[in-house]
Amino acid sequence: MKMMSVRCKLAQYLEDLEDVDLKKFKMHLEDYPPEKGCVPIPRGQMEKADHLDLATLMIDFNGEEKAWGMAVWIFAAINRRDLWEKAKKDQPEWNDACTSNLSMVCQEDSLEEEWIGLLGYLSRISICKKKKDYCKIYRRHVRSRFYSIKDRNARLGESVDLNRRYTQLQLVKEHPSKQEREHELLTIGRTKMWDRPMSSLKLELLFEPEDEHLEPVHTVVFQGAAGIGKTILARKIMLDWALGKLFKDKFDYLFFIHCREVSLRAPKSLADLIISCWPDPNPPVCKILCKPSRILFLMDGFDELQGAFDEHIEEVCTDWQKAVRGDILLSSLIRKKLLPKASLLITTRPVALEKLQHLLDHPRHVEILGFSEAKRKEYFFKYFSNELQAREAFRLIQENEILFTMCFIPLVCWIVCTGLKQQMETGKSLAQTSKTTTAVYVFFLSSLLQSRGGIEEHLFSAYLPGLCSLAADGIWNQKILFEECDLRKHGLQKTDVSAFLRMNVFQKEVDCERFYSFSHMTFQEFFAAMYYLLEEEEEGVTVRKGPEGCSDLLNRDVKVLLENYGKFEKGYLIFVVRFLFGLVNQERTSYLEKKLSCKISQQVRLELLKWIEVKAKAKKLQRQPSQLELFYCLYEMQEEDFVQSAMGHFPKIEINLSTRMDHVVSSFCIKNCHRVKTLSLGFLHNSPKEEEEEKRGSQPLDQVQCVFPDPHVACSSRLVNCCLTSSFCRGLFSSLSTNQSLTELDLSDNTLGDPGMRVLCEALQHPGCNIQRLWLGRCGLTHQCCFNISSVLSSSQKLVELDLSDNALGDFGVRLLCVGLKHLLCNLQKLWLVSCCLTSACCQDLALVLSSNHSLTRLYIGENALGDSGVQVLCEKMKDPQCNLQKLGLVNSGLTSLCCSALTSVLKTNQNLTHLYLRSNALGDMGLKLLCEGLLHPDCKLQMLELDNCSLTSHSCWDLSTILTHNQSLRKLNLSNNDLGDLCVVTLCEVLKQQGCLLQSLQLGEMYLNCETKRTLEALQEEKPELTVVFEISW
């Protein structure tokens, strides 16, 4: 009889796996340790493979011996000991000479067809080798083309190594919302880095499905604000693929397409496009396109296409050899009319998302959020070759909160670094670095002029009016690419533009020599704002007019600009107006007039003030700008006198804050507002406390409104997860002493820190402060601020509720707090010290508080390593008749049955205790038996007992039944996450049916119960409707 082959044997083992185990096997196979020297199997081939196919793939990729070893290892990993033992005994005898290594021939480029046996595989080896040769040639070309980038201010011939300069960007999978489609530059300080948590995404998983049952992703859209790093990320993807670091087994070819270049070229075919990417004029186009599923087209800058994708354009191209207009060619690829099986990666600004969305079928949207705080630091250290300079520059920017926030945008980070380096090289102080967008751009422009010398500066001043009018014309007409005729229309010549190229004001397109653009959209907005400020001298009289030949919209009347603000499609005017406010700052105006030898209008200041006055008094701002946007404009100016005049017109302020920048901006404006009577602030991600639904009152979670007496201003009571820092809190806390209506303050999830807490404590001790409830969870506090908190506790009788959870106070910090808690004037009723790094050492101090503080009724000290000894110390004082504690939380405190005797003594003697939380402590059946003694005592008044996840088994059934039968006070019992078993639960149901059982709520979540027990529970619920039974069956 012929021996069974290894492949058949392996397939036979895999057939023993149920569907769930087979999925686990594939998952472990995908994550098989690379150090074991095995070749990974492409996910696309593996996910649809059945038992036989999977066995074939494993052997074809790694040979029989390694495949068998992999299977044995994975059987153990998925807890199939039966198969593991059987496979070890049944292991074939290997012949090293016959070990299959054929799969290594095409290791760089995986075969996409199913493997159909060794004979078919051998017949394709020669084809695979040829394909590999073409791939190698093209990869080398891509490496050469993309290994370096040219810095924006680089001299001729200078470039920067992309791998050395590139800093990782934050990528998240999100569906674009209306807010995300607003003008991209408004995302400065508004990204969701400090908002709700998001699912980050790795580049290698871009085209992988979120669920293994779903089809692979074929279209990915990178969206992000201008300057956020879309293009450099696209180039990095090209380089990593060429280096074999990315998509190695997924794509044979990646083609980089500049959307704006393609749309401006003469009609070309897809074949022409590939030829333009190839290192020589004769690429194997037919062979490349014969497998479109192995091709990725990377389209950079969809939003920069000229006139493409209008709704009325229906012309498409389905022939890869047919020459068509560039926009039609790209449209056909995107709409999957041409090469429908090819994959696409498209980068775009948010403003073009709506237009793009209608063309795509099930795309994956990935948002580029820019740099995290850690990556900003990394970027500084990569930009500055000198580590001391990098450290000094980063420290300076980090101290400047608003500018540090703006640096999450890579372009702004580059501008800041460039400006700082320029100052360092000239030996000037870095203290002049400003904190507004306008100041950054003015400083950068100044740096450019200084680096070019006096003659260039004089030329720039002469051509500045034309440059500004060109920018404004482009803004009004939504135009970013200009031809030479556009330059001439605004008094500019081609020779003038070459000077701007050197100064980095303009960027000449590499392959589109007849077209010019500002190097970045924000530069265009900046110069457009200057257009409304510049005055011209004409026969001794100062006039303000637009260049000859420009449209009527280009008159210099700023009223026209402001009237259209908010109405203009896509919000292109938003940043122009912000820059306008920043440029009319008097010091900045004087600086620009001197530096650029120009005359700047003072009339614009009055027009801006009138505009703010009208908007401030409007009953409801149905259109842009919102009040917060007006505040951003005022903040950009940085003139307190002007801001005070403007804010004097606000009778009511209603704004929603979500970022650090929002807080800084609003704080700057609100502190200069002396007439506002009502302030309503909305915040993101407010969440109620787990245990006390009533403690929040009736205020809505998303907005709290406070009315303040003139002339002082305060803030809303709810500031959860708003990235507050001490700079914002000073303005907030100063109002606590005068606002009589503010009684609740929630500062949870803010980087308050000990310095901010000290500022808050000063305000809380003021006689005029009426704060009663204060929540400070996760505020970065340590023992260093506990003395200040203790002083508040000993001086303020108004404070009745304090939450300090998730702060590393430690035992020493609690000892300091206890000094205040024991003070006669302390009136605190509720205290949370959950997860505060406490041990049994602090329990003696807390015990003294329990016996001396008669107001404290609720103490939550769970998630701390108190241990049995610590709780025993607490219990000694809780037996004191003077102890008024009603609720005690000891969740996950490292307790065992050893502390249950002490707890039983408390239950027998303390009739005040009504709630006891013992969740996630290994009390066991013995612990419950000891507690049962106290619960059956006639003096026990406990109403709520939480024993979730306390290691109880069916042996506790008798004690639980006894408690339910005889305890007359217990109303709520949580037994979830315990292994009670079906029989015990059915027994409890019978007890609960009795008339003498007064329990109102029973929780049995996460129990392994059968269907019969489930029906018994449902029947109990119907028979006794006053009893609530919560059960979540785990199978």
UniProtKB/Swiss-Prot annotation:
Disulphide connectivity of cysteines: 8-106
Positions of LRR repeats: 741-761, 770-791, 798-818, 827-848, 855-875, 884-905, 912-932, 941-962, 969-990
Modified residues annotated as Phosphotyrosine in this record: 13, 134, 138, 166, 860
Region spans: Required for binding to phosphatidylinositol 4-phosphate (PtdIns4P): 129-132
SMART domains per the UniProt record, alphabetical: FISNA, LRR_RI, PYRIN
Gene Ontology molecular function, alphabetical: ADP binding; ATP binding; ATP hydrolysis activity; cysteine-type endopeptidase activator activity; DNA-binding transcription factor binding; identical protein binding; molecular adaptor activity; molecular condensate scaffold activity
PROSITE patterns: DAPIN, LRR, NACHT
Domain notes: The pyrin domain (also called DAPIN domain or PYD) is involved in PYCARD/ASC-binding. The FISNA domain is a critical mediator of NLRP3 conformational during NLRP3 activation. It becomes ordered in its key regions during activation to stabilize the active NACHT conformation and mediate most interactions in the NLRP3 disk.
PTM (free text): Phosphorylation by MAPK8/JNK1 increases inflammasome activation by promoting deubiquitination by BRCC3 and NLRP3 homooligomerization. Phosphorylation at Ser-805 by CSNK1A1 prevents inflammasome activation by preventing NEK7 recruitment. Phosphorylation at Ser-5 in the pyrin domain inhibits homomultimerization of NLRP3 and activation of the NLRP3 inflammasome: dephosphorylation by protein phosphatase 2A (PP2A) promotes assembly of the NLRP3 inflammasome. Phosphorylation at Ser-293 by PKD/PRKD1 promotes NLRP3 inflammasome assembly. Ubiquitinated; undergoes both 'Lys-48'- and 'Lys-63'-linked polyubiquitination. Ubiquitination does not lead to degradation, but inhibits inflammasome activation. Deubiquitination is catalyzed by BRCC3 and associated with NLRP3 activation and inflammasome assembly. This process can be induced by the activation of Toll-like receptors (by LPS), through a non-transcriptional pathway dependent on the mitochondrial production of reactive oxygen species, and by ATP. Ubiquitinated by TRIM31 via 'Lys-48'-linked ubiquitination, leading to its degradation by the proteasome.
Catalytic reaction list: ATP + H2O = ADP + phosphate + H(+)
Self-association state and partner proteins as the record states: Sensor component of NLRP3 inflammasomes; inflammasomes are supramolecular complexes that assemble in the cytosol in response to pathogens and other damage-associated signals and play critical roles in innate immunity and inflammation. The core of NLRP3 inflammasomes consists of a signal sensor component (NLRP3), an adapter (PYCARD/ASC), which recruits an effector pro-inflammatory caspase (CASP1 and, possibly, CASP4 and CASP5). Homodecamer; inactive NLRP3 forms homodecameric double-ring cages that hide pyrin domains within NACHT-LRR rings to avoid premature activation.
Sequence motif KFERQ-like motif 3, location on chain: 797-801
GO biological process per UniProt: acute inflammatory response; cellular response to lipopolysaccharide; cellular response to peptidoglycan; cellular response to virus; defense response to Gram-positive bacterium; defense response to virus; detection of biotic stimulus; inflammatory response
Sites of Phosphoserine modification: 5, 159, 199, 263, 293, 332, 727, 734, 805, 1034
Residues noted as binding ATP in the record, renumbered to the chain: 167, 224-231, 520
Chain positions of cross-link Glycyl lysine isopeptide (Lys-Gly) (interchain with G-Cter in ubiquitin): 322, 428, 689, 877, 972
Protein name stated in the entry: NACHT, LRR and PYD domains-containing protein 3
Short sequence motif KFERQ-like motif 2: positions: 603-607
EC number(s) on file: 3.6.4.-
Principal place of residence: cytoplasm
